[in-house]
Amino acid sequence: RSMRETKIPFIMLVGGRGTGKTYSALLDAYLHDVLENGRKFLYMRRTKEQLKMCCSDKYNPFRKINHDRGYNIRPKKEAGTISFYDGDTQIGGGIALTSVDDVKSMDAFDTDIIIYDEFIKARSARRMKGEAENLADLYETVNRNRELEGYPPVTLLMLANANDSANAIFVYLKLVSIAEKMQVKGKFPAIYRNDTRLLLLI
């Protein structure tokens, strides 16, 4: 929650597996965006295959939250994407980065946060042509003219376990050398921020 209160649009949280990154991000989106403000969230993975897996009970990203809090938040496949439901109420959507071209006409006026889970590819995964540019296109699709209309920008919250400083997103945002220096110092959590970017290594 405190990271979003900075109003910085691009937030990257990188750390070891099992540190609660996805859990905390989704719980905050549900409590703050959905319940408090009647808004929706957009959950994203790199590939369509990863997104489809989320629709199974085993890989539902809300699985542990449901268990811990007695919720019933379920993803359902819908026309090439997925939607998240709390009972019968749609509370969010899901998209793969590889499907960005399919949703450029999407109207996401009711969405204030994009949660990009596992944004750094695993070592064994293939590189994606135009990965960072596709992400920028998606952000523009969701954000549109909000700031011109007097609204705060959409928050793009990116989460990852893999610690590859030379990933496509860091290269695009000119964060490679910054992340490498943070890692060399070896003091965690480590944080870097400016007006548009916040990077937290844990």
Feature-to-residue mapping (PLM):
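Phosphate/NTP-binding elements of NTP-utilizing enzymes
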Residues: 1-202
